[in-house]
Amino acid sequence: MSQKTVLLVEDEDNIALALTHLIGRAGYALRRVASGNAALEALAEERPDLVVLDVMLPERSGYEICQLIRRDAVLRGIKVLMITAGGGEVERRKGMAAWADAFMTKPFAAADLTAQINALLAEEGA
């Protein structure tokens, strides 16, 4: 079985560094980009198993990226975990309305993030 791949879309370097460490430690291959347009370019190049997608990004929002993934016949099966510092029920509902598979509010515990990623990738492999 090949290693699962994660595309991390996060524009804040300090958060991206922490997430890169956590995701890598969990045993997943990782690619990080820092903007909405870079996310679309990365998705055109390769199909990850999971996209960890910040809501607030330069150029295009995470909501827009998620909707574009879901509308694309080739990409729509990719799992999407949206993350935001904006928090609150309204943001979570917007993320789920954009067809995200899961939504987490920063700050979150490392164990919670790892558990969520593991669960999404277990579903993907089922």
Model-based region annotation:
Residues 10:
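Conserved acidic carboxylate
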Residues 13-31, 120:
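Two-component/phosphorelay signaling modules centered on CheY-like receiver
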Residues 20, 64, 87-102, 115:
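Alpha4 helix (beta4-alpha4-beta5 surface) of REC/receiver domains from two-component response regulators
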Residues 32-50:
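Acidic, metal-coordinating helix/loop segments flanking the phosphotransfer/catalytic sites
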Residues 35-38, 61-67:
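Acidic catalytic/metal-coordinating carboxylates
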Residues 58, 76, 88:
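The feature encodes the CheY-like receiver
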Residues 108-118:
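C-terminal output helix
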